Swiss-Prot record:
Disulfide bonds: none annotated. This is Methionine--tRNA ligase. A motif ('HIGH' region) lies at residues 15-25. It catalyses: tRNA(Met) + L-methionine + ATP = L-methionyl-tRNA(Met) + AMP + diphosphate. GO terms for biological process: methionyl-tRNA aminoacylation. Zn(2+) binds at residues 146, 149, 159, 162. The gene is metG. Homodimer. HAMAP family: Met_tRNA_synth_type1. One of its GO terms (molecular function) is ATP binding. The lineage of its organism: Bacteria, Pseudomonadati, Pseudomonadota, Gammaproteobacteria, Enterobacterales. It comes from Shigella dysenteriae serotype 1 (strain Sd197). Its cofactor is Zn(2+).
Length: 677
């Protein structure tokens, strides 16, 4: 049946740019990719996009810890993420970043529209402040007991146990994640999105029947408890977009993160030179379909805040949210100590991508159920289904076709009724792919695979091959087997892209959904090559051990300037203003008799001479080389009496010590006596 081509935009939740992709992430990206590949097979116009979620205090602090800029860190992480997704053959049309000009412009546009429409409210709030670090604490940097369900060790914005959202100030016994200190309250003006104004619209959207039943039920609980205004601002220091006309205030990461879907699509349109599609997809009355694949932990943001923000800024709402559960490994939460917290890149060092794609797909449904990756069952299922049932069907027939018939298939089907049984299944299997009942689709396909192998077993081509005068029968039987293999691989094409490529090369034809209605008759196939290898538990053991070793390596002490010499406690501007830094000319430099560490420097401050002892001898074995250089000194440091004389200040140098000491110098043009400001 010919379908009307649809315009579809599909997104996955944006991975946070401060960590590697792991098998928990991959469930969502594989689920979405299988669905997208099926839609493309049916002739629909699909744009599949994602991006890194690149803002927030965690990224700012981790970059500081690594001694690099946030921009450098998120750039490196983006490359790593894209490499992982490419390794799993996730067919994104575009992968972008929320730290982009497109996202900045769209965030400011949506904010300005919300403000113009009266949906942004200002008020002063009491906020948790870390007295040791001298900074306001973002939601995720406060932990305590959930005020709703009383679960301990929950973040300051939402509870991972009951799903409730709340203010960090509502936490019971809060602690700073940064320092462990008990936060104190300080006042700060913040901006709030008036979510309650959209309650009626959101309830109507919930009752529309589009959302998963579990999502709709959860939303109803939130409506009954009452929607609250949403704090969309954060105080400096913060890595993100500064709010227009609000110095020192930044958009909360959860405001610009979902807008990143729009930013990535805008970036894709611009790359294509397409000035039309963005508005066509995102305008209020768009006929394009918009689907977000997300995990159950972020339903609140996507089912309430996001559609309300879009409604309030005159953009279209999502067609639907496709929500999935978590991944467990061997029936337990992923564990670093047990080696079951497995990174995507580590997996690909031990197994191919198709194996995990198949296993996840076989277990997925349209419900929000957790998926267990049982590693022993994984090995058994991949070998039983992919190797023994599907690939074996091709291999046990291809040899005869290649050797006895020069690769040419029979001109007629040996069993047209059986072939029709296979092609008639397209409707049921297609509906299962469409409705995300992936496990059902796989069960239907494997039932057909059993039927195909039973046919070959009953026809016994290996026996027929030994009987004189039965060449035509042999060709017909094996051609039938290969045609059934072709149908199976067509149904599995959304799941197994690499195996599909090898199957298409052997079959000498592209696998298309509608193409199976016409069997391959009198068609020449290519010489058969091994399509897929068996896997075993030794690979699993190596994978688990490698994951354990990675955890050990990650737990090793972090090295680098900031790790070796952490930043001191925060001081006020008034404290810093007391330090008088001046440019000084080194008029003379010489060794200090009786000291193997000091040099005596004679400094000219532009009308005043100073004598300074500096512990830089190990880095400057030839003091004469310093004469004539400009440097920076602390000019108002109290004179210090030493056994070699009086030191009248301090010169500024950087480095860990020893030979690695580097005297600081001002830029060209600075003159002795100039104050450093």
């Amino acid at each position: 049946m010919t379908q009307v081509a649809k315009q579809i935009l599909v997104t996955c939740a944006l991975p946070y740019a401060n960590g590697s992709i792991h098998l928990g992430h991959m469930l969502e990206h594989i689920q979405a990719d299988v669905w997208v590949r099926y839609q493309r097979m049916r002739g629909h116009e699909v744009n599949f996009i994602c991006a890194d979620d690149a803002h927030g205090t965690p990224i700012m602090l981790k970059a500081q810890q690594l001694g690099i800029t946030p921009e450098q860190m998120i750039g490196e992480m983006s490359q790593e993420h894209q490499t992982d997704f490419a390794g799993f053959n996730i067919s994104y049309d575009n992968y972008h970043s929320t730290h982009s000009e497109e996202n900045r412009q769209l965030s400011e546009l949506i904010y300005s529209r919300l403000k113009e429409n009266g949906f942004i409210k200002n008020r002063t709030i009491s906020q948790l402040y870390d007295p040791e670090k001298g900074m306001f604490l973002p939601d995720r940097f406060v932990k305590g007991t959930c005020p709703k369900c009383k679960s301990p060790d929950q973040y300051g914005d939402n509870c991972e146990v009951c799903g409730a959202t709340y203010s960090p100030t509502e936490l019971i016994e809060p602690k700073s994640v940064v320092s462990g200190a008990t936060p104190v309250m300080r006042d700060s003006e913040h901006f709030f999105f008036d979510l309650p104004s959209f309650s009626e619209m959101l309830q109507a959207w919930t009752r529309s029947g589009a959302l998963q039943e579990q999502v709709a039920n959860k939303m109803q609980e939130w409506f009954e408890s009452g929607l609250q205004q949403w704090d969309i601002s954060r105080d400096a220091p913060y890595f993100g977009f500064e709010i227009p006309n609000a110095p020192g205030k930044y958009f909360y990461v959860w405001l610009d993160a979902p807008i990143g879907y729009m930013g990535s699509f805008k970036n894709l349109c611009d790359k294509r030179g397409d000035s039309v599609s963005f508005d066509e997809y995102w305008k209020k009355d768009s006929t394009a379909e918009l689907y977000h694949f997300i995990g159950k932990d972020i339903v609140y943001f996507h089912s309430l805040f996001w559609p309300a923000m879009l409604e309030g800024s005159n953009f279209r709402k999502p067609t639907n949210l496709f929500v999935h559960g978590y991944v467990t490994v061997n029936s337990a939460k992923m564990s670093k100590s047990r080696g079951t917290f497995i990174k995507a890149s580590t997996w690909l060092n031990h197994f191919d991508a198709d194996s995990l794609r198949y296993y996840y797909t076989a277990k997925l449904s349209s419900r929000i159920d957790d998926i267990d990756l049982n590693l022993e069952d994984f090995v058994q299922r991949v070998n039983a289904d992919i190797v023994n049932k599907v690939v074996n069907l091709a291999s046990r027939n291809a040899g005869f076709i290649n050797k006895r018939f020069d690769g040419v298939l029979a001109s007629e089907l040996a069993d047209p009724e059986l072939y029709k049984t296979f092609t008639d299944a397209a409707e049921v299997i297609g509906e299962a792919w469409e409705s995300r009942e992936f496990g059902k689709a796989v069960r239907e396909i494997m039932a057909l695979a059993d039927l195909a192998n039973r046919y070959v077993d009953e026809q016994a081509p290996w026996v027929v091959a030994k009987q004189e005068g039965r060449d035509a029968d042999l060709q017909a039987i094996c051609s039938m087997g290969i045609n059934l293999f072709r149908v199976l691989m067509t149904y599995l094409k959304p799941v197994l892209p690499k195996l599909t490529e090898r199957a298409e090369a052997f079959l000498n034809t592209e696998l298309t959904w509608d193409g199976i209605q016409q069997p391959l008759l009198g068609h020449k196939v290519n010489p058969f090559k091994a399509l897929y290898n068996r896997i075993d538990m030794k690979q699993v053991e190596a994978l688990v051990e490698a994951s354990k070793e990675e955890v050990k390596a990650a737990a090793a002490p972090v090295t680098g300037p900031l790790a070796d010499d952490p930043i001191q406690e925060t001081i006020t501007f008034d404290d810093f203003a007391k330090v008088d830094l001046r440019v000084a000319l080194i008029e003379n430099a010489e060794f200090v008799e009786g000291s193997d560490k000091l040099l005596r420097l004679t400094l000219d401050l532009g009308g005043e001479k100073r004598n300074v002892f500096s512990g830089i001898r190990s880095a400057y074995p030839d003091p004469q080389a310093l004469i004539g250089r400009h440097t920076i000194m602390v000019a108002n440091l109290a004179p210090r009496k030493m056994r070699f004389g009086i030191s009248e200040g301090m010169v500024m140098a950087a480095g860990p010590g020893g030979k690695d000491i580097f005297l600081l110098s001002p830029d060209a043009g600075a003159k002795p006596g100039h104050q450093v400001k």
